[in-house]
Amino acid sequence: GDVGTNAVAIRGNAPQFTQWRLEGIEIPNPTHFADLAGLGGGFLSALSTQVIGNSDFYNGAFPAEYSNALSGVFDMHLRNGNNQKYEHAFQVGLMGIDLASEGPISKKRGSSYLVNYRFSTTSLASGNDINLKYQDLAFKLNFPTRKAGTFSIWGLGLIDRNKADVLERSEWETMGDRSSGYNKLDKLAGGLAHKYVLDENTYIRSSLSATYSKDRSLADLHTDDAIINVADIQNSRWNLVFNSYLNKKFSPRHTNRTGITITELKYDLDYKVSPYWGLNKPMEQISKGSGEST
């Protein structure tokens, strides 16, 4: 990657082949505007440093629990909120407003909450004419019990909007000057997790989670006489994931993890693109369909 993106290229692989995981499950790329770039790098992480806990990064030789990744794996976790006192944070930067809050739900039981919300300051400053707008929300609720283990509820969501307006006709020099477009990206992930400690070296963790992502892209080419639609792309994906494993630490150098992951996949896509941009040709159906798999 470079300083202008959130891309990570590993062993020459494109950033889109990196797997992102949160709270033990695979999630859509948690980066704003990630799917607008062909390489999948994105612009800004949707996970604020206010909420990130212990995380692992693998650039090869993945453990058996990781699949569906060609280059690397980011295995991230949300930290628990402070269960003793309330803390709040407010930050303003060039790219956005960051609001965070954490504290106890019940001091007696040790339960806590953590929530973080960000909103692009560029849209606040420029209203509806700004090209890039984004929002993201992340939270985690933690509920320890005396005998039944620890329950947690977590979630992550991001909303991206990108609008490219055509230049004034007097400024047209290239085909890009005569193009306009609109992109909308929505991503959600969340779940319920349970961890039960059997002894100081053994625990069982189970979770039921869901992820959702939807992309919509429109592009028009402006001529002296008309506006021609050259792209209309819609892509939606849903995943329902059940995961459970037993973790056993035999020694400081030997830990075994045995479990199962069941994923139900659903998709719905509709791709219409003009095959010859600039030649004023109508759009053609490139791909259309829906389905599911487990």
For the regions a protein language model found, what residue spans apply to each?
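Face-selective signature of the C-terminal outer-membrane beta-barrel domain
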Residues: 142-160, 181-294
